[in-house]
Amino acid sequence: MSEEIKKIEEVAEQDKAPKVPTTEPPVDVPAPVTEEAPKVEEAVAEIAAPAAAEGETATAAAAAPEEKKKSGGVARRFTFNKRWGKHRDAEASTPKEPEAPKDPKEDVLGWIAQQIPQAVHKANYQVIDWVQKTAIPEEGERKTIPGKDQATTRNQFIGFFKDGDVLAKLANALEPGAVEVAAAEENADAAAQKEVQKKNIDAFGAWAQKTLGTEAAPVTNEDLLEKGKAGYTAVFQTLWQLGVQAKEKFDKEGFNVDTIVQLANSVVKSGLLTTILGFFRRNRQAAAAVEEPKDETAAAEGAGEAKEEGATGEVADTADEPVAVKQETSAPAAVAAN
């Protein structure tokens, strides 16, 4: 009986209407925005950073071909150079003083550096000529000096003294018995001949060191046999000093420095004159080439007039008369000028 009463009470409680709330519901108060804003900005920055990096990479990759085309494939970083702008203009406006001419007696290498190649070739020939005349008294035993118009190039100059024989003879001519001349055996191979050349060159270099008072040998076999044109300076300077001091030290006739300087200067003047004449000659040939088409046009017009006269019948019958043909040829410009 009691269980039934409990069930009836439970059903009655379920059927009751809910109680009306006597208090107001809680209100949600939003948090201040200022505190969360930095976090949002940081999050946005973190998200945007990879995207920006990818965008920059893509832009750089797209611009790379254009930069390579402009700079030839080499990326260059601009650096400030003081030669730009006012500094550059100031340097350009400042006239440079011409270098004073060197005295060949005191600084022959400086003098050589100031000369044009043709003038140096003239000096080379004169030095070889003095060496041969001093070292080999008999004219028939002398070798032919290489070069055209008494002008010897640097390579020819080195090649002339490469065997060392003339150098050893020069030392003995200036100071008898100074150098023992080595000679190769008959039918000796190239290696044996080269060893003989080295001995003669080194013997001459040792004698020149003692004679000129230098710290080391002024000429070595490498200067003549290995270095090529790079050895020209040492050989030329040594022979030049011997030629200048020959009279003082050995009472032998040396070469005249003033004569060599005059020959070099004459080459410079003649070279300048040749350049000027060539300029006017080219202009005259160009003018003659322009005038030739006019002469051909006039001849063509004359031939056309003759054809018109024959067509109109103004020319009489000339079947029984010999016809004289006049051939006009345009003479060359040089002949016309003469």
Swiss-Prot record:
Span list, region Disordered: 1-35, 50-104, 290-338
Topology in the lipid bilayer: Peripheral membrane protein
Quaternary structure note: Self-associates (via CH domain). Interacts (via CH domain) with ced-10 (GTP-bound active form); the interaction facilitates the localization of ced-10 to the cell cortex.
Pfam family, one: CH
Transmembrane segments: none
Lineage: superkingdom: Eukaryota
SMART domains assigned: CH
Basic and acidic residues: compositionally biased ranges: 1-18, 87-104
Annotated function: Involved in the actin cytoskeleton assembly in dendrites of the PVD neurons via a ced-10-independent pathway. Involved in assembly of microtubule cytoskeleton, intracellular organelle transport and neuropeptide secretion in the high-ordered dendritic branches of PVD neurons. Required for the proprioceptive function of the PVD neurons. Promotes the formation of cellular protrusions. Facilitates the localization of ced-10 protein to the cell cortex by stabilizing its active GTP-bound form in the BDU and PLM neurons. Does not associate directly with G- and F-actin.
Record gene name: chdp-1
Tissues showing expression: Expressed in BDU, ALM, AVM, PLM, PVM and PVQ neurons. Expressed in PVD neurons.
GO annotation, cellular component aspect: cell cortex; growth cone; plasma membrane
Bias (Low complexity): 50-64
CDD domains attached to this UniProt entry: CH_SF
Protein name (record): Calponin homology domain-containing protein
Keyword set, alphabetical order: Cell membrane, Cell projection, Cytoplasm, Membrane, Neurogenesis
Cell compartment(s), UniProt: Cytoplasm, Cell cortex; Cell membrane; Cytoplasm; Cell projection, Growth cone
